[in-house]
Amino acid sequence: MLYFLLHLYNRQFEIYVSSVGLVRELPSIKNQVSQSRIRVFPLLREPMRKKNRKGDWRMNAKKVIIDCDPGIDDVLALLLALRSPELDVLGITVVCGNVPTTQGAENALKVLALLERLDVPVYLGETKPLVRPYVDATDTHGADGLGESFLPNVTQVRPKECAIEFLAQTLSEQKGVSIIALGPLTNIARLIQDYPACLEGLGELVTMGGSYKSHGNCSPVAEYNYWCDPDAAKVVYEAFESYPTLRQKQIHMIGLDVTREIVLTPNLVEYMTCLSEEMGNFIRNITRFYFDFHWKQEGVIGCVINDPLAVAYCIDHSLCKGFSAYTTVETAGISLGQTVVDAHDFWKKEKNSHILTETDPYRFMTFFITHIFGADASDVRYVLRQIMVEDAGKRVWMPKDEEDYVEMLKGDVVK
């Protein structure tokens, strides 16, 4: 027996069924609804399938520490990281950024509690930038950093002190651990200044920050994370050019050039809620504020989610393309926080960074939904095509009449 969730949205019915196969059998449904079009969405076959966190999965997983300033997109990135069997999250270090450090730590614990992963430790890091005054981003993320959802704090465990010491000890004891930095680079700069020897064992540094050709999001030229603490960003980039232990490595810069391509829309949130009511409602509650901000500031229907792309890239480098170059960060004047990328090698300096400039939103969103919700990839791809997520620069074709609609049901049609 078929179960349908049917609702009216802008004079258009959307029908959710249990699998793509059933969609193929439903061309006659359109005749039952006059003066409207139908879009058909397959539901998850195994709602909210939990990853098995027992056994030897950690042996093959990439060991990472996530350094973040948990606002809305950081939390989505944490969801992705903690639901990905490819990653073994050794700990979460918190830095001041979107919200003050203590609030960011509370938000990280809320995610861990939601996923029943309070075994992952949370550490308090720096509470102010290296030099300049601290300016938060609560205008973007809400007073609590989670869209003013004001979820209750976690009481079972509390954040630990000394994020820098945790980073140093972990990198010294376990070779090949990577850092995914989703906030200002203050903690990472302090680590470099205080414990440079531990960096020899660093795996990768993937940072969400900066931009190459894209405009800024807090000034005409600067992205917030690097603008919040430009001195720290400069320390980190210069270290990868000058420190002997880091000169053979590069910073992977996931900047606004690629993250602006990743837009979470109301349709996608609705679909996620169908996959898991609990997780979907959590995402809906924390992103409402974000939706309003993006509409008022940039005319975007939905919200740009920067940080999850950095996590996805750390798992699968093929999700983004780019080039290697020397990069530095401006620390004064009207271009404060700007990443200066020497793409044409004018300065003949060591290429200290890998600048990502291209991504595929369709592939990313498939990755995001399948990992967080345990959804079947073929079903997710079918849904994304119907709700017009861009696929490598092409917009998915939507039917204009009955004949086109039947053709769509026969297969995935892209024109």
Regions found by a protein language model. Name each.
Residues 4-11, 32:
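Short hydrophobic targeting helices and cationic amphipathic motifs
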Residues 57-62, 79-84, 88, 227-231, ...:
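Conformational coupling and interaction surfaces
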Residues 122, 236, 311:
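A residue-level signal for conserved active-site and pocket-lining positions in enzyme catalytic cores
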Residues 40-58:
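Short, Lys/Arg-enriched N-terminal segments with co-localized hydrophobic residues
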Residues 62-64, 105-173, 352-359, 364, ...:
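Metal-dependent C-N hydrolase catalytic cores
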Residues 22-23:
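Intrinsic, low-complexity polybasic segments
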Residues 60-68, 72-110, 144, 150-259:
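Active-site histidine-anchored catalytic micro-motif
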Residues 14-17:
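Short hydrophobic alpha-helical segments enriched in small aliphatic residues
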